[in-house]
A protein has these predicted regions:
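Glycine-rich beta-to-alpha active-site loop
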Residues: 2-16, 20-66, 108, 113
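Charged, glycine-interspersed solvent-exposed loop segments at helix/strand-loop junctions
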Residues: 67-124
Length: 124
């Protein structure tokens, strides 16, 4: 799977990751250009040992984006859903990279840029 994308809606990305986990064959992921936001989770979800990045690829991780509006109760519901999405992203990153949940939480707390060198890249 070749990736060059700024991400997208987390629910759409989760559907891709679910399908990657469903198929019985290995899934090779190759990053080039820009792989950002939730798309970096797709990169990390490739089969271990079959995740690659081109030399000048920009890989960026961040919190799932979203906003809240409406009544106080609606804002609380939306904020809880955003928190759930963040925990899902942390879990995916932790399970695919072997990093602790705390390390992944810190990595996702703000925009984090990863280099393409395999030993330095969390997603490799």
């Amino acid at each position: 799977m070749y990736l060059n994308t700024s991400g997208g809606q987390q629910y759409s990305i989760m559907a891709v990751i679910d399908m990657m986990n469903l198929v019985k064959c290995d899934v090779m992921t190759v990053a080039f250009g820009n792989v950002a936001s939730a798309a970096a989770l797709v990169l990390a979800s490739g089969t271990k040992g079959k995740r690659f990045s081109m030399k000048n690829t920009r890989i960026m991780l961040n919190q799932p984006l979203g906003g809240c509006q409406g009544s106080f109760v609606d804002v609380k519901i939306q904020a809880a859903e955003q928190n759930r999405n963040l925990k899902i992203a942390q879990t995916i990153l932790s399970s695919t990279t072997g990093r602790t949940m705390d390390e992944c939480a810190e990595l996702l707390d703000r925009e984090s840029f990863l280099c393409a060198r395999p030993r330095a890249c969390y997603a490799c």
